[in-house]
Amino acid sequence: MKKLIFYLLFFATTLGFAQDIEWDPKTTFEATFDIDAVHTRDGINYELSASGDAGPYGKAYISYVFTNYNNSTSNGEFTGFAWTQMGEDIVKATLQGVFRKEGKVFKMYSYDNTTDDDKIMIVSGIVDFVEQTMKFKVSPLK
C-alpha cells in the first residue's frame, strides 16, 4: 500500500511540475538558409555563416559558433547571431541551443532572443552540411 501511495504521489508531482511548450500554428513559420561558409580555427570549434529566407522577417543572415564542452562525439552546443532588415526596420536576435548528429544530418534546438517586441523564439531544425542547407521551424514562445 505504501508503494502504491508513493507511486501515485510521484506521478502526480511529475505531472504537476511538467512544462509544456506549444507551437502556435498561427505564428509558426519555416526558415530556410544556404550555408555560405564553415571554418575552424582550432579543429574543435566551428563557425558557420548562412543566409536565406526567415518567413515574415524576409532575407536573414545568421552566424553560429559550434562548441563541444562535454567532448561528446555526437552532440554539442552553439551560440549565434541573426540579423534581418524589413524596409527601415532591423531585427536582431541572439541564438543559443544544442545540436545532435543523427545519421548524415544534424538536428538543432534553440531558444532565440529577438529585438522584435522582445519575442523569444523556439526553433528546431535540420542542418545538412553535404547539401549546404539549414531548414528550421520557428515559433514565438507562448
PLM region descriptions:
Residues 19-142:
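Beta-strand-enriched cores of mature, soluble protein domains
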Residues 4-13:
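Sec-dependent N-terminal signal peptides
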Residues 16:
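Cytochrome P450 heme-binding "Cys pocket" and the immediately downstream C-terminal segment
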